[in-house]
Amino acid sequence: MVKYISILGSTGSIGTSALDVVSAHPEHFKIVGLTANYNIELLEQQIKTFQPRIVSVATKELADTLRTRISTNTKITYGTDGLIAVATHPNSNLVLSSVVGVSGLLPTIEALKAKKDIAIANKETLVAAGHIVTELAKQNGCRLIPVDSEHSAIFQCLNGENNKEIDKLIVTASGGAFRDKTREEMKTLQAKDALKHPNWLMGAKLTIDSATLMNKGFEVMEARWLFDIPYEKINVMIHKESIIHSLVEFIDGSVIAQLGAPDMRMPIQYAFHYPTRLPSSYEKLNLLEIGSLHFEKPDLEKFPCLQYAYECGKIGGITPAVLNAANEIANALFLKNEIAFFDIEKTIYKTVEAHHNVKDPSLDAILEADQWARQYANQLLIKKS
């Protein structure tokens, strides 16, 4: 069966890896739609190669520019409406959500309403609105297939298993670019230092989130919704080699782990062709060459963002959306070298402390909380500067 795929965020690291997978298996995958933010040069090349029916970019100006540069019959749209148009295109049956941040929420929700299966790589969608997204998927008979290597690993480990027999999920973490630094050393580190991830090729925002361990916190929150497991049963373990992508421990003491070379094309290909596997030419795992694997507990005093994620997830309501929004603002300013590394965690803490929670929020309440938190975090950082 051919999968007809729309990719939200086709010019980012996940999107380009996904298109590598499509190119490797053209008999199995066809591209229907693509979206980019501002990188229309790369999008133009992708349009020529994959000839999608529809694409979307950030602004009308970029859309107008792109129209002058392509000769295909591809429809060109823009903005949030454009994202939604790509996500809900009638010719697609699978949507890869790989845009960065909460901007992936609305198109994912609309895609589910249109009865599309979702290959989900956008963490923030489940962080901010996990209860809404998972319920919509159930109502519409849609599959949420994880793309993150950690969640793909758990998904594969649980294949054919009974969720009631799970004792705990163990999500592995590389530890990020600053894993071997002391708090004192981290005080003066800049974005350029954080962007050197030890194991994975990732976008800038995600690499900073990895350095603070907020990325791992988001993955814990994501796992709670993807697998319907309480936070008390989700553990994090530092594993510097990034060979074991996650583990599941069962009530009888048995542990199943999923291993593989750190290459995002593998979980993407698994998600695209689920429930069956395809051959690949990607690097194969050789444990004899690796020799040994190492594990340790995360240091929550050194990396408090992971603890914040657990606490906000347990509180629920709009609190996770507030956490996410404050992190997005602080992360972006750190990338511009406008704030210090520790200002990220301080901004998140103060913003979460200042908000008033709403239990079982509607989508509108979540979006309002997102906007409030962005403004509050911005004001905190403006006052600081």
From Swiss-Prot:
Pathway: Isoprenoid biosynthesis; isopentenyl diphosphate biosynthesis via DXP pathway; isopentenyl diphosphate from 1-deoxy-D-xylulose 5-phosphate: step 1/6. It catalyses: 2-C-methyl-D-erythritol 4-phosphate + NADP(+) = 1-deoxy-D-xylulose 5-phosphate + NADPH + H(+). Mn(2+) binds at D148, E150, E219. Keywords: Isoprene biosynthesis, Manganese, Metal-binding, NADP, Oxidoreductase. One of its GO terms (molecular function) is manganese ion binding. The keyword NADP applies. Its cofactor is Mg(2+); Mn(2+). The keyword Kinase does not apply. It holds the Pfam family DXP_reductoisom. NADPH binds at T11, G12, S13, I14, N39, N122, E124, G203. It comes from the Bacteria. 1-deoxy-D-xylulose 5-phosphate binds at K123, S149, E150, S174, H197, S210, N215, K216, E219. InterPro entries: DXP_reductoisomerase, DXP_reductoisomerase_C, DXP_reductoisomerase_N, DXPR_C, DXPR_C_sf, NAD(P)-bd_dom_sf. It is an enzyme of class 1 (oxidoreductase). PANTHER family: 1-DEOXY-D-XYLULOSE 5-PHOSPHATE REDUCTOISOMERASE, 1-DEOXY-D-XYLULOSE 5-PHOSPHATE REDUCTOISOMERASE, CHLOROPLASTIC. Belongs to the DXR family. Catalyzes the NADPH-dependent rearrangement and reduction of 1-deoxy-D-xylulose-5-phosphate (DXP) to 2-C-methyl-D-erythritol 4-phosphate (MEP). This is 1-deoxy-D-xylulose 5-phosphate reductoisomerase 1. It comes from Bacillus anthracis.
